[in-house]
Amino acid sequence: MSSKAVAHPNIAVWIMALGIAFSMALVLTAVFNANPWEDHTYDLAPPIVAGMPAPHRDGREKMVCSSCHIVTPPAIGTGPGSGTLPIVQGTPAPHVDGREKMPCASCHTIVKKGSVAKGAKAAPLPAAVTPGMPLPEAVSVALAVAPAPAAVPLGNEAHERMVPFRYQGKVVSIAGAGARSVWGDIYIQINDGINPPIWIDLAPRWYLQAEGCVVRPGMFVKGTAFRDPTQAAAGLDYAMSVMANGEICALRDNHLNGLWANAGGMDAEER
């Protein structure tokens, strides 16, 4: 009887300690809910103009600027009125390459609705336009996206002629059969703001969904891929891995064999 009486308080203490530890874990998880594997603050870092010195002096100046910042091309001209179109006050920015986060007045003349900017030089009227005809104050131009290169059969010895490289950048466009069907391959066009945009063949859409690496336009992705040196950036590259949504997904092995071949896609429609 005495041994049982001594054991009960010890069990109660351990149960109470485990309950306190579990409660503290819940509180800390709710307070510090930042996932260290999530994508870094790529969308929060201010854009950097290509050719400008790095704004950091704590060691980050040795890193690639496009890892955290959107690199924009240098502006032509020295200020407002140097060939840029005016912007009507209150309208959304006409850019989608990172410049939409910059103050519009840095490059454009801000025009109030229904008025003409003071001191702005009137553009010459086209020959077919008569005086008195209202002219548009701002123009939104849609940028054309180059179509994705056609995929070619790789063969068993494709890895011997292709070279590996690292890629990173923002997803500009998505193409391939995976854009229409869960069973098709997904091609992404990425732009790092410095080099010409490239097309990369990732994997079937169901495999990306199963691995948690679904990509969308505007996302920052990076990884490793194989490229045919005879085609350079004009051809279709083949990804070995991709990091998206904070997840790192292996897509192909060193012989360019898709890892989804042994994964199976029986329940892909349910994911």
UniProtKB/Swiss-Prot annotation:
One Gene Ontology term, aspect cellular component: magnetosome membrane
Stated name of the protein: Magnetosome protein MamX
Subcellular locations according to the entry: Magnetosome membrane
Keyword line: Biomineralization, Heme, Iron, Magnetosome, Membrane, Metal-binding, Transmembrane, Transmembrane helix
Keyword match Mitochondrion: no
InterPro entries documented for this protein: MCR, Multihaem_cyt_sf
Residues reported to bind heme 1: 65, 68-69
Gene Ontology MF, one: metal ion binding
Obligatory cofactor(s): heme
Family in the record: Belongs to the magnetosome MamX family.
Positions contributing to heme 2 binding: 104, 107-108
More details: This bacteria makes up to 20 cubo-octahedral magnetosomes of about 45 nm in diameter which contain membrane-bound crystals of magnetite (Fe(3)O(4)).
Regions of this protein lying in the Lumenal compartment: 32-271
Keyword Heme: yes
Spans traversing the lipid bilayer: 11-31
Gene responsible for this protein: mamX
Function per UniProt: Required for correct biomineralization of the magnetosome, may be involved in redox control of biomineralization. May function with MamY, MamZ amd Mms6.
Native source species: Paramagnetospirillum magneticum (strain ATCC 700264 / AMB-1) (Magnetospirillum magneticum)
Side of membrane Cytoplasmic, spans: 1-10
Ranges spanned by the short sequence motif MCR 2, renumbered to the chain: 87-110
Cofactor binding comment, as recorded: Binds 2 heme groups per subunit via the 2 magnetochrome (MCR) motifs.
